[in-house]
Regions:
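Mobile genetic element proteins and their domesticated derivatives, centered on retroelements
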Residues: 1, 48, 81, 107, ...
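Short, flexible loop/hinge motifs at secondary-structure junctions
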Residues: 1-98, 168, 214-274, 283
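Short, positively charged, Gly/Tyr-enriched micro-motifs
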Residues: 66-164, 440-442
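Conserved catalytic alpha/beta cores of large enzymes that bind or transform nucleotide phosphates
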Residues: 93, 108-110, 122, 321-353
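Two-metal-ion RNase H-like nuclease active-site motif
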Residues: 162-175, 295
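Flexible, glycine/threonine-enriched loop-and-boundary segments that flank and lead into catalytic domains
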Residues: 166, 275-280, 393-397
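Catalytic nucleotidyl-transfer cores of nucleotide-processing enzymes
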Residues: 177-334
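Acidic/histidine-rich catalytic cores and adjacent linkers
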Residues: 245-269, 288, 292-303, 332-480
């Protein structure tokens, strides 16, 4: 079977307003020299003819890169104590094993940010004169990375606790020769990835817990269960029990068994809905605010305040097959109306008013309740009209985006990694890949060079100090 890829909708690009005074001419780049710090100055001599007068210098700045092997033999002093014991001088900060901080920094940057494969990285290092093998490179990538894994987890917690909105997406991922899924969560300040074997709503709620392992029965959990139409007598059993917090899946399952919930024959599945509710209660209990989750309409992401991506919604109209001139004309008309409406939604985000909100709601109804005579298109418009609260979430929350382009851009690095290296074979390898790719994207969003970030974390001499990323995220979220 051949699958033809349809290009992305031009909805987003077509409705981007040009700034006042802008033109189609390319903007000239600024001076490169002003952005550079000079490391070395060389004077170039000239054999001047007799009678010439010296008139100073003409500067010509050249950027270069110095890559060379640097082997250090640390001779640590040893002293014998009066009691017969021996003391040895400690190595400098940043020295951990027989490969120095600069080499470890280079390996992580090339593999995660440069998307290199391990064999090619080994070949490159050997060409520099480094004596290293594939197994040693793998150890540099996955061993003793607890600090980075913790910072990636804390980045997610800081991002979720301070976010007015997040966008989410997922893609396929291979782990231990089994198909799985990688979920992206992020916004303008952070990005995080998590690879699991499922893409269910239960899985998404577990990811939103950001490493916490508890199940909580609180007001938010009960509201979720009622929204999902869980039987009232099942909710009553959970409410009547005095214990409301359970640490670990075993404790939660034991609690459900004690209440006799798994044995109930009701619809929807009481265990699944109760577990989802307890997970949602845990998410809210750990500081998840009234955040809007913007998605592409995948069912697993429909929790809490939920908004939909307009680009994905319009793409459904764009992808319809029209076989007659009348159908094509109807399709083009609807797409044009949606484009214009989308542009006005973007303008509303910049200057929201109550009057414009009312007008846009009425205009939405006119567009998505129209009958075109193109049956497939009419059914699609009815389907989109049913999503009115999610599509018009921006009217009540103007700060949220109208699309999930940010998530799609972020998750491309996972797709590239999958194509380059297929999949992971160990849990620590999977966790390190997800954590470092998330840190790479987060650094880019915070305008921090990943190379500088690694230099600070590996205590490379002369590197600038980089504060913990979660602190920067919280500070950015508080700033206007």
């Amino acid at each position: 079977m051949v699958i033809l890829f349809r290009g992305p909708s031009r909805l987003h690009q077509a409705s981007n307003p040009k700034p006042p005074g802008s033109s189609n001419e390319r903007r000239r780049r600024g001076s490169t020299r002003s952005k550079l710090s000079i490391d070395e100055v060389r004077n170039v001599k000239l054999a001047a003819p007799p009678g010439a007068r010296f008139k100073g210098y003409t500067s010509f700045v050249v950027q270069d890169l110095v890559i060379r092997r640097h082997v250090v033999n640390f001779r640590c002093e040893r002293w014998q104590m009066p009691d017969g014991g021996t003391m040895t001088a400690a190595l400098l900060d940043g020295i951990d094993g027989h490969f120095g901080p600069q080499l470890r920094r280079f390996v992580l940057a090339q593999y995660h940010q440069g998307q290199m494969t391990v064999p090619r990285l080994v070949t490159l290092l050997r060409s520099f004169g480094i004596l290293i093998c594939k197994r040693q490179v793998l150890r540099l990538l996955i061993e003793r990375q607890d600090d980075f894994l913790t910072e990636a987890r804390d980045t997610l917690r800081a991002g979720l606790s301070s976010a007015a909105w997040i966008t989410v997406d997922d893609t396929g991922a291979r782990h231990k020769a089994t198909n799985g899924f990688c979920t992206q969560i992020g916004n303008a300040h952070f990005a995080w990835f998590g690879t699991t074997g499922s893409k269910s709503r239960l899985n998404f709620l577990e990811l939103l817990r950001a490493g916490h392992d508890d199940y909580v029965i609180n007001a938010e959990a009960l509201a979720y269960m009622r929204q999902r139409a869980l039987a009232a007598h099942v909710i009553a059993r959970l409410v009547e029990h005095p214990e409301r917090r359970f640490v670990g899946r075993k404790a939660w399952n034991a609690h459900l068994e004690a209440l006799g919930i798994p044995a109930l024959k009701v619809n929807p599945d009481p265990v699944m809905v109760a577990t989802e509710g307890a997970l949602w209660g845990s998410v809210r209990a750990h500081g998840f605010p009234d955040t809007v989750i913007v998605s592409d309409d995948a069912g697993q992401f429909n929790v809490g305040q939920h908004g939909l991506c307009w680009v994905h919604s319009e793409r459904l109209v764009h992808k319809l097959d029209a076989f007659t001139a009348e159908n094509r004309a109807a399709q083009a008309t609807v797409r044009d109306l949606i484009w214009q409406f989308y542009a006005d939604l973007k303008a509303y985000r910049c200057h929201p008013t109550k009057r414009r909100k009312t007008a846009l709601r009425a205009r939405f109804d006119r567009i998505f309740t129209r009958m075109t005579g193109f049956v497939t298109l009419d059914r699609l418009l009815m389907r989109l009209n049913a999503n009115k609260p999610e599509l018009l979430m921006v009217l009540d929350r103007p700060e949220i985006p109208l699309h999930t382009n940010g998530s799609e851009n972020d998750i491309r690095c996972q797709v590239t990694r999958r194509k380059v290296s297929a999949g992971t074979r160990s849990d620590i390898g999977r966790d390190c890949r997800d954590a470092f790719l998330g840190l790479v994207k987060t650094c880019a969003k915070l305008e921090i060079a990943f190379w500088d970030y690694l230099g600070d974390r590996f205590v490379v001499p002369g590197c600038q100090a980089i504060p913990p990323l979660p602190k920067i995220i919280l500070a950015r979220a508080r700033s206007p």
